[in-house]
Regions:
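Basic, Lys/Arg-enriched alpha-helical interface segments
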Residues: 1-73, 83-85, 93-118
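Short, surface-exposed beta-strand/loop micro-motifs that present aromatic residues
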Residues: 76-80
């Protein structure tokens, strides 16, 4: 029985000013919530590609990791995959059944910024 290998490595999207929104967002969560999200991201790292209920495709090259936090809160981390890199673009606590347009647009803007930097 061999050691399971990562299929994708995680990287935080950084703006031109070096701001990593997802990393900063994670720091504000409780240790338990960070662990839940970390476990879910690790599952994606080792099992990519995955589908529901953990990962849902939102748009072309854009997916979300769906995590349950304490107090029945739900978080979403929007990401893209470039080669063997899973790039975490945007994160938020979900408050409605649909992904808010503003959060979706933020992730898409970060994704196009990555494309321009290539």
């Amino acid at each position: 029985m061999g050691t399971k290998r990562k299929i994708v490595d995680v990287q935080f999207y950084k703006s031109d000013t070096g701001n990593a929104q997802v990393k900063e967002w994670l720091k504000k969560l409780t240790p338990g919530d960070r662990k839940n999200i970390g476990d879910d991201i690790r599952t994606v790292e080792f099992g990519w590609p995955l589908g529901m209920p953990l990962v849902r495709k939102i748009d072309t090259d854009l997916w979300e990791v769906r995590s349950t936090l304490s107090n029945n809160r739900i978080s979403r981390i929007l990401f893209t995959v470039c080669g063997d890199m899973m790039i975490l673009l945007h994160a938020f606590i979900k408050k409605t059944s649909k992904t808010p347009k503003n959060d979706l647009n933020t992730a898409k803007r970060h994704m196009s910024h990555l494309e321009r930097k290539k």
